[in-house]
């Protein structure tokens, strides 16, 4: 049985959840998938970095509270993240990038992906920034070095939207996509329908773990804007940049607006959409829309997300599922690793075999 050695870049909720899956279900996953997973490096902005090319013991790290974790006192540990050195030099097969999203320029995640691919390492990421802003470049770099670049979790976390479009719609023409792609805004709009004010609804979403401390990206549509870019570019073959996607958030909608819509059989939703125009260009936008009750997206409530694919032969096909959550997003990373195995090692049904020099076992 082969094995993939992983470098986890960022050790927040998502990569920590992936480490939990590997630690708690590693043997079962290896039996089911036909390959083992081993973490050989972890970097984190606060905790520093930890390297052991014989495999990091994850259990004690996972037992510590996230805010209390410090790698400096451990063998192979450092107070510095050392992201570039870890990505370029530590012998890992797959770099798992799960740092924060920067919608402006994709950094530092974009550099992380570039370094890894140039070093001949596969990359999987949940980070929307590099995927939305530089996907074609990163795919080309991956192809040049014979490695994979996977990003299923960048749109709907664990719900497989991109692979559904890629694998299940062969022979169809997808003419447009339309979706509810942000659980925070969807939850908030639902609470507005119940008469709760915007600030109170956002505070509830933060308490439940749906919203970040700064909810601007969710409420003002920046998060969905990046996701629309990814869908339009990947599914419709567009080449959009952020400025091409018209954006409006939900901050102007009041409880009175939401309740008035419900009384008329409508529901306000923050909808991201992209549609091909007759001339072949793509119209893309994010905006609150009062949807009629029969619309396939109208019944999507709370943190659940959904995307409706408009096709020439099947009409509208809607896929829904969790659009957030650390475990769900970690599963997207696992599905990316499986995709890397299938695309690059399916013929021999093996993952790489490793022989680790003794002198590099701890750094």
Label every PLM stretch briefly.
Residues 1-118:
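N-terminal glycine-/serine-/threonine-rich beta1-alpha1-beta2 phosphate-ribose binding loop
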Residues 9, 13, 17, 37, ...:
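Conserved active-site and cofactor/substrate-binding residues in soluble primary-metabolism enzymes
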Residues 30-37, 215-218, 239-245, 270, ...:
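Flexible, glycine/charged-enriched surface loops at secondary-structure junctions
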Residues 94-97, 124-126, 149-153, 176-179, ...:
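General beta-strand structural signal in soluble alpha/beta enzymes
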Residues 100-119, 126-166:
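Rossmann-fold NAD(P)-binding glycine/threonine-rich loop
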Residues 143-211, 218-223:
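Rossmann-like NAD(P)H-binding beta-loop-alpha module
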Residues 176-181, 186, 204, 209-216, ...:
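Catalytic, metal-anchored helix/loop core of enzyme active sites in primary metabolism
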Residues 191, 202-299, 304-306:
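Substrate-binding/catalytic subdomain of NAD(P)-dependent oxidoreductase enzymes
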